């Protein structure tokens, strides 16, 4: 019966995703469905409600953090910080390195802002605009944008995904980042080589005519983005603060508050906003003034309510599943995979299955954690495994919002996922490394047994 209920839930999630229904509605329906299953199995409604609330309590801090991130992104837009970064880096997109530059610039933006969607809409849009006019197929550019946009989603100190993983595993984002950097170093280098190689093979902007046209498009793109903003090097202060405080491994609330507060001051001093306008932008998001680029609109607490609601509702599942033992069969299968191929393979399998069904990165992370919990006893390693699987695999599923939204923002087709090299290389590389390590461990155990 549990399998049938899970099948109905998966079908509802997939159908709602294809029909464009907000994810929160099938999630709410799933909560009632799972409560009904528990009641049919003889579990009390009050006991299940208590279990659900206890699991919600574990993500209480992250919900507040989501709101702080909304404030940060609004203030970075209002202060001109994002505009300034785009303005000074857009000139890198030229010639055969255009795909590599697109990937690297989106990596930089996503690391600083912690948002894949925001990166795709700002830096991704500009890079796609320049690349398309240079004759680069949007199919390839979309892969570079998608790859770079999720670089920061995985390892940024202000990433909601990283924070969710840390909360679920009982670890700390600042302490997790060094391990994430190490595990992604080789995939990152390989992705850079592939993007550079494709640019060279295509001969992007190789002739003089293309170079002249590309230079003109860069100027137009930068001018459109920067129009109406008073840009000075001071706009970099919020980004420098976030990076510096992250290196000191301070609490994420302190990092976010410092980044948002410094940007709010710049919005008033450099962009001429008043205090009520800043306060309103913190709540509803930044609304560009006449003459400013509409690409900068967004952010604010309101922008985070959707993902916060998804996390809030889906967090109840953990308590319900634990109370009703609904996932015991699936969990046993995942543990069998871990016993045969190692914990990373098990986490990757669970995360991939969740990503295909759930259509939501947040839900993939939470259910992937639920299914593979116990496969890796070390909390730090388990957090790293979730980062190397659930966080990036979600963006490779064409019908997932994690994939569809960034690609739609730059006008790229779903097939661009095949050229999102970084997102494929992170789980593939680490799977290979962990399989070798697991086999060596088994071999050593056999020798010791003799």
Indicate residue ranges for each PLM-predicted region:
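C-terminal transmembrane helix pair
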Residues: 168-188, 319, 338-450
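Alpha-helical transmembrane segments in multi-pass membrane proteins
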Residues: 8, 26, 30-34, 38, ...
